[in-house]
Amino acid sequence: MRIGQGIDVHRFSDDPARVLFIGLVEIPGALGLAGHSDADVATHALCDALLGAANLGDLGRHFPDTDASIAGVSSKSLLEQTLKLVSDAGYRCTSGDITIIAEAPKLASFMPAMSEALSAVVGTVISLKATTTEGLGAIGRAEGIGASAVVLIEEK
């Protein structure tokens, strides 16, 4: 059994039409995050944790923001491709946990849908929770959103 940890942070977009996705779920009425893909911090942190656990580097190594062919890609696609890399390395995920760090928007009502969506793709329970930074730092000033993820993987 191996453990992996991932962290991701994105600032809010200047584009008022940008959609916010967290944990593969669209958060209606909220300003989206800036990024090369859909900027889903929870899913990106999960991907980084999976890649780290399998000793496969990080998300940027496999899906660089300089690759125009993946501009605007959905994080579901990144997660599916990440799981394939992990599987090809001989592992499968047995557990995952994500903490979303944000002052706004409030996400409690979206947590069950996020867990369901991520769990369906990964094939095991992915739990989620949210916290704030009590107004401290860039996230505390509501300049963006962050996420931290931890996973357990085992040999297939």
What function would you assign to each model-found segment?
Residues 139-156:
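C-terminal edge-of-domain segments
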